[in-house]
Structure formats: C-alpha cells, structure tokens
C-alpha cells in the first residue's frame, strides 16, 4: 500500500469509526461488535503510525489521551455560564411561569412555549469549534472563566472532535462558519452509575468518590488525559450558539446539536402549560431509578431565544429558565455519636456520626447538626433511629427522630462548655445560636481551619493544599498562618513524608499561582467573621486596598451598601489585631494583590446616573469587565432594554436588544465608540 492509498484508507476508516461511535454513544444502537470496532481502531492506529504526517487533530485515534498537563490555563467564557435558580415545588414553578408571562406580555408577546429537559447531575463545560474542529474545551469555573481542559474533553466519546456534516437541505449556513463565527456548545459531563461503581471498586476505601458527580469533577481535573480516557465519561449537550443558528429556537438548536453529532439526552419536550410540564416531571421521576445515570430534576426553558434575550438575567441566573428538583430522598439509620468541630472563626458545630447508610448513590456516615438549638429542637439522643435527607449535592442532614424506636440505653447529648481543641471556655454572643471559642490565634483547630479556608477553591484556590497537607505542614512547624505558605522552601517539603520532587514542586506551583488571585478573593480568604464571598466583593468594590479597609472607621464601613453594624464591627476589629498586621506584612512581602485592579471611587463619572445595556459579542472586554468599567464610573448595567435605558453598547452579532433599542430611540454606540468614551475621560 503506497502513501496515497494509505491516505484514502485512513479517511475511510475515520468516517466508519466516527459513524460507529455516533451509533453506539449517541443513539445506543451499535451496528458492530466491540471486537470489530477495536479492530478498526487498531488498523487506523497502525496506518497512522506508519504515516505520522497523516495524523489529524480530529482523528478517532486522538481520543486516547496524550501528554501530562502540569497546569490548566485559565480561559474566559464568551458569555457568562450562569447557574440556574431552582425550586422543589409546583407552586413556585407556577410563579416562575407567571413572571415570564407578565414580562413577555409587557413586551407585547402573547404566544410562546417552553422546553423541558432532564437535569443531569454532572459538571458543566464549554466547547469552542472553529471551522467545525474542536479547538477549546473549558470548565464552568466561576462562570466568567474556567480551566482549559481540551485534552481531557477530547477523550469523551459523545463530544465530536469534528462536527458532523449538516443533513441535506439543512438551514445550517457553512458560508458563515469561519474564524470570526466560532460555534460554542455547552453541556453537562457525567458518569454512569455502573462506571462510578467500577471506579470506586478499584480504589481504596479512604479514596472512594462520594457520588458520580464528584467522580466526574475529579476525573476532569486529572492532569494525564490518558487516565481520563479510561473513565468513560459522557456529555449531554444543551446549548448551541453561533451565527448560523441565530434564528433557531432552543428546541430547534437541540435538534441541530443532535444533527451535528452530539448526544442531547434521554428526553426533551415542548410544553405550553404547567400541566404539560408536570406530566413531563412525573413521567421522569418515575423512570429516574431505571436510568443509567443520575438525574436530579428537570430544566424548564423559554423556547424562543429572542424572548430569552428580552427577559435577560440577574447577576446569578437567567430569568427565562428554572431548575425543578425532585424531592430529597430519605433514609433511616442510627445516631452513633455526636462530635464537636471548631471552625475558622471559632464557631462550634456539632456533627452527627451515623451508622453508614446508602442514600442517593452515596454512603452517608456523617451529617452536620448545625448548632445545639437544632439538637434540642429535634430532641436527639445518642442511639436514636434518625431520618437523614440528601438532595442533590447538598450535605446530608438529620431531619427527624423515630421516637417510637428510641432504645432504653439512649443517652442525652451534653452541651459543651469548653473548646474541644484548646480547652478555652466558650462564649455565646447575644442573639446568636452559635457558641464560639474566643482563643482565635491560639486554638489549633482554628489555625488549621483558617489555613484550609485560605487555600479553598473560592478563596486562593491553592492546588494540592488540602486538609491533610495543611495538618502535615502545621505539624512540621513550617507554617503558622497563611502568610508562611509563600516562604516555604522545597528542601523543607522534601524532608516530609509523602513529598517527592514532583509533589513538592506541584504544591509550590499552586502557591505561586495563588498570588494572582483577585483582591476580593483575598478578602474572602482572610476568614473575617461574617464576611462571605458576597460581602468580600462589596468591600472590594467600595474600598480600593486593604490599607483603606484597615483605616476605615466602623461608621464608614456601615455606610457601605449591605454592610450592617455586626459586619462592620467584625471587620474593624479584625484589622486591629497584631497577628493580622503580621499576616498582612507577610502577604505584602510575598507579592499578593493587596489592592484592587479597579479604578478608585473618584474615577471620572462618565456614566453617572446612566443605565447601560450590552448586546452582542465584545472583542476587547468580557461582559463582566465592561460592566465593571460602567459601574466604576457611576453607571448601572442591566440585561434588558426599556424606556429607562440610557445607552446600548452593540457588539458583533447583536440581536433583539439592538432592534428594541432602535425602536425605542435609545442611544446606541459600537464597542469602538464605548472604548473612545473610556479613553476620552483620561485624555488618551
């Protein structure tokens, strides 16, 4: 066989293998045996090995995985990957439908419908195709940006490496499919119940995954794509965006996704009423246990994409969609003991130790009890038969006692008076249900919890620095507070058990990477009592640096929107402590961001009093960055165009919002003109 004959054979093999892949993974209708399929793959691999210059990125041989990736690059999403608001009851679902109806009627829309789709319990990802070829795959991350995991996603059999050719007579416009018209597909990657059980059977008990979703998330974080390939992940596609599909409804886009080679799920249905939706929900709740994978409900979406744009979104979720979650599943087990944990702020939390019981695919042996008042409310005793509940990814909780089954030897749960970690007498602030250990910097449990929090995903996101490693570093005396992390030397790590050259360097790389985290994430990472992610973001917007926060009085802090007296007092007190001053000094020497990248509050108020709407794709900003620039300059950004809108910034592929702005006579500027407005304020 000469090279030209081999090239023709390779093309034919790829077509045949891709077709069999589609039949097997998307249609569940295999036409040949596994043995024959493997034989085709082997023949292809042999020919490509003989003629390596004929290997292409979309060849089926490239799914097996390649080199190890040391770190995942961060990529920004074209548009934010928002989460969905959710409900567990039909009444709230009806309220959602009523809100949609009211909003659409105010826009003169009378006829519309919805799609109902199964809600798969997995990990959301985004795929970018250029000229039909998969060029990028990324995790949802924080919604604005995520990890670029293209190599790992290429191993997922239901993700086409190259999109299938459109059917004859398709509305798909290949003329518009070019570099400026990239196509984005989003979906949920998940693992079947059978594959989940198989993976756990091969792992030590202490390393087993809690559920298929956790197993999927852990798999996608693997740095060796060959390992990912072994775990047989699946993706269901639910979102399609690109110029060729601009006029299609959501339901039509799902059909187009299937045509292009994607798996679009077990079922989706067009619904016109609450009764239609309820019928879909009931049908699949009855069928869910028979499915090969976990579902936790259904997603209801407004079908017309133009109407979706009219409704827009809040900062967290779209107004045109909602997730209906099936009722939590319950199980009965024995409360064997109650232990008390000390958190990063000194809060004492009782934790139930349970006789292990299987629930929703997980083995449950522990559950939070929140506080002592909850123990009293439930009248819990050691030895009681208790009811536990678990819904989706929520931590399991004890919701009741089977009082008639209480054994004679059941014991009451005695409240604590001293800290279980350091022995300090506990304090009980007025108007709070939580007890606290006041030994903030001397309590070993608080020190450990603060470090774990500092390294956590929503804080500094330090890869490889989990609870066990924190405990090891504390035990070796290498760290005392988060600032010490940035001065650890590799030689010190190599002297510790379980640390080799690679693991030590990986940890140091993770610590170094955390220096680039945003100012608001650093505020959250400090672990100030009552300061969660939302409050940290508010502080970062209001104050430009840690120095300005430190120097702010309690009264000035109280003047900040959404910050009341309790939070203000806690923040002001935190920065007066010598240990905090020492920590901030270390962080500054290490080169962390102790100030915001945003302009100061006295930046020119170009958009003061204005309401701005962005539409279409922006080339030089993400939506979040553009909105931030408006906010810093006194304006407000909304997602819908109305008579109150002052300005519409129109990017590429602007849709219904642009048309509505023209109809209402709202001022419209291009992205270039928006940039000119920003530049003019500084005389650039």
UniProtKB/Swiss-Prot annotation:
The keyword Hydrolase does not apply. This is DNA ligase. The keyword rRNA-binding does not apply. InterPro entries: BRCT_dom (IPR001357), BRCT_dom_sf (IPR036420), DisA/LigA_HHH (IPR041663), DNA_ligase (IPR001679), DNA_ligase_CS (IPR033136), DNAligase_adenylation (IPR013839), DNAligase_N (IPR013840), Hlx-hairpin-Hlx_DNA-bd_motif (IPR003583). DNA ligase that catalyzes the formation of phosphodiester linkages between 5'-phosphoryl and 3'-hydroxyl groups in double-stranded DNA using NAD as a coenzyme and as the energy source for the reaction. It is essential for DNA replication and repair of damaged DNA. Gene3D superfamilies: 5' to 3' exonuclease, C-terminal subdomain, 6.20.10.30, BRCT domain, DNA ligase/mRNA capping enzyme, Helix hairpin bin, Nucleic acid-binding proteins. Its EC number is 6.5.1.2. PROSITE patterns: BRCT, DNA_LIGASE_N2. Residues 602-684 form the BRCT domain.
């Amino acid at each position: 066989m000469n090279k030209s004959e081999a090239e023709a054979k390779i093309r034919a093999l790829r077509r045949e293998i891709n077709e069999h892949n589609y039949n097997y993974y998307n249609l569940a209708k295999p036409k040949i045996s596994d043995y024959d399929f493997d034989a085709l793959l082997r023949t292809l691999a042999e020919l490509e090995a003989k003629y390596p210059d004929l290997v292409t990125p979309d060849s089926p041989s490239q799914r097996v995985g390649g080199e190890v990736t040391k770190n995942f690059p961060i990529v920004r999403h074209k548009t934010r990957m928002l989460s969905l608001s959710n409900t567990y009851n039909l009444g709230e679902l009806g309220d959602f439908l009523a809100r949609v109806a009211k909003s659409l009627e105010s826009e003169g829309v009378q006829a519309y419908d919805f799609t109902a789709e199964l809600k798969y319990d997995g990990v959301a990802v985004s795929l970018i195709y250029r000229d039909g070829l998969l060029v990028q795959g990324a995790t949802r991350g924080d919604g604005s940006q995520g990890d670029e995991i293209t190599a790992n996603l290429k191993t997922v059999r239901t993700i086409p490496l190259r999109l299938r050719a459109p059917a004859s007579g398709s509305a798909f416009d290949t003329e518009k499919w070019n570099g400026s018209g990239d196509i984005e597909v989003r979906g949920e990657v998940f693992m079947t119940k059978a594959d989940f059980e198989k993976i756990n059977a091969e792992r030590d008990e202490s390393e087993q995954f809690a559920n298929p979703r956790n197993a999927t998330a852990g798999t996608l974080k693997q740095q060796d794509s060959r390992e990912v390939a072994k775990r047989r992940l699946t993706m269901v596609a639910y979102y399609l965006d690109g110029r060729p599909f601009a006029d299609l409804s959501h339901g039509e886009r799902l059909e187009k996704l299937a045509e292009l080679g994607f798996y679009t799920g077990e079922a989706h249905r067009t619904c016109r009423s609450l009764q239609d939706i309820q019928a879909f929900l009931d049908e699949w709740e009855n069928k869910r246990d028979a499915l090969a994978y976990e579902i936790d409900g259904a997603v209801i979406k407004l079908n017309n994409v133009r109407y979706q744009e009219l409704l827009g979104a809040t900062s967290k979720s779209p107004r045109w969609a909602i997730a209906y979650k099936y009722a939590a599943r319950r199980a009965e087990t024995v409360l064997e003991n109650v232990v008390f944990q000390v958190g990063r702020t000194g809060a004492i939390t009782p934790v139930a130790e349970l006789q292990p019981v299987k629930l929703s695919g997980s083995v449950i042996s522990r559950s939070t009890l929140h506080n002592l008042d909850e123990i009293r409310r439930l009248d819990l005793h050691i030895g009681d038969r208790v009811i536990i509940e678990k819904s989706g990814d929520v931590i399991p909780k004890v919701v009741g006692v089977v009082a008639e089954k209480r054994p004679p030897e059941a014991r009451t749960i005695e409240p604590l008076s001293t800290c279980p970690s350091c022995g300090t007498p506990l304090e009980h602030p007025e108007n709070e249900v939580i007890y606290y250990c006041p030994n903030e910097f001397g309590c070993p449990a608080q020190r450990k919890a603060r470090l774990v929090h500092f390294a956590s995903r929503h804080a500094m996101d330090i890869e490889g620095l989990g609870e066990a490693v924190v405990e090891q570093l504390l035990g070796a005396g290498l760290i005392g507070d988060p600032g010490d992390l940035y001065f650890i030397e590799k030689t010190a790590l190599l002297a510790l058990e379980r640390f080799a050259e690679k693991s030590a360097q990986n940890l140091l790389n993770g610590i170094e990477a955390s220096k680039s985290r945003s100012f608001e994430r650093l505020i959250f990472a400090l672990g100030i009592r009552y300061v969660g992610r939302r409050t940290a973001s508010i502080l970062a917007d209001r104050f430009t640096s840690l120095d300005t926060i430190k120097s702010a009085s309690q009264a000035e802090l109280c003047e900040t929107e959404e910050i009341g007296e309790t939070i203000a007092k806690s923040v002001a007190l935190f920065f007066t402590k010598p240990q905090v001053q020492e920590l901030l000094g270390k962080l500054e020497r290490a080169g962390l961001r102790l100030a915001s990248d945003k302009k100061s509050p006295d930046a020119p108020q170009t958009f003061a009093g204005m309401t701005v709407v962005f539409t279409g794709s922006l080339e030089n900003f993400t939506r979040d960055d553009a909105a931030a620039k408006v906010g810093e300059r006194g304006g407000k950004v909304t997602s819908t165009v109305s008579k109150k809108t002052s300005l519409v910034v129109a990017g590429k592929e602007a849709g219904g919002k642009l048309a509505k702005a023209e109809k209402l006579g709202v001022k419209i500027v291009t992205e270039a003109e928006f940039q000119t407005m920003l530049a003019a304020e500084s005389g650039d």
